[in-house]
Amino acid sequence: MSKPIPPLDLMWLLMESQASPTHVGALLLFEKPKRRPNCVREIVTAYRSYAPTPPFNYIPELRRTRMPRFQEARTYDPQYHNHHIALPAASTYADLLRLVADLHESMLDRDRPLFRNWIIDCVPDDRFALYVKVH
């Protein structure tokens, strides 16, 4: 299935460059539930268990020979889109923010659905984080 790219989405895709990416990101912090010691692993498993639904399964098709369209992804790699990482021992919130800044810097791969998630374990104060990057 394919569908026309809405004008606002198309504007962001056309304006984007390596020097000026136009994706957005969100960092969410959570307290670990006291009675769920494996909650982070459970979340990672859940995220990797489901294929994305529209619009998160679309890939932009920007050819000069036809109207720009979103094409449904033929394949989906849950490991690529849903990462599980842990901060090193004794990390601080500043370390978390540096990590997220580094993750945010690169453009999303336009040959794959335009989102990535990082579930980040070992955040200070017995927390975990979710960093979401979308176009």
Label each residue range with its predicted role.
Residues M1-H135:
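Non-catalytic N-terminal regions of enzymes
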